[in-house]
UniProtKB/Swiss-Prot annotation:
Organism name: Acremonium sp
Name by which UniProt lists this protein: Cyclic ether formation enzyme pydZ
Domain of life: Eukaryota
Topology with respect to the bilayer: Multi-pass membrane protein
EC number: 5.-.-.-
Function: Cyclic ether formation enzyme; part of the gene cluster that mediates the biosynthesis of pyrrocidines, fungal natural products containing a macrocyclic para-cyclophane connected to a decahydrofluorene ring system that show potent antibiotic activities toward Gram-negative bacteria. Within the pathway, pydZ functions synergistically with pydB, pydE and pydX to form the cyclophane.
Signal sequence coordinates: 1-27
Length: 124
């Protein structure tokens, strides 16, 4: 196994860990109160900006994000599905970046995550 492949794997594990942290933050504020509060405050705005066509409640969208983050975590932890998981993550981060731009928020968090995912794809 080349060192580039090992780097891609470690970046994937890091992204999977962050995705699992997002699941926790969506479900409870016990371990990450500030992150959880930020997600709950911004979710209604993102719902109106990007997901208006779906007609979902903010609560339903929260659970959609939980399922998406669990899926990303599972894909990135699976050796066979990791390549697909990275590409899937990049597409979804693009949606998050678009939402940030539409709402006039700082795109830095999504840009950093896109860079990490892009690096993992590039060295794979």
């Amino acid at each position: 196994m080349s060192s580039a492949h090992v780097l891609s794997d470690w970046l994937s594990y890091s992204i999977a860990g962050f995705s699992a942290l997002c699941v926790q933050a969506h479900l409870t504020s016990r371990f990450t109160p500030a992150f959880s509060r930020n997600l709950s405050e911004k979710l209604p705005e993102h719902n109106r900006a990007v997901f208006w066509w779906a007609g979902m409640s903010t609560r339903a969208l929260r659970y959609v994000f939980v399922v998406i983050n669990i899926t990303i975590t599972a894909l990135l932890l699976s050796e066979e599905l990791r390549s697909f998981g990275l590409k899937f993550s990049l597409v979804l981060l693009g949606v998050g970046f678009y939402s940030d731009m539409k709402l006039g928020e700082s795109p830095v968090p999504h840009m950093i995550l896109c860079s990490v995912v892009g690096a993992a794809i590039l060295v794979r």
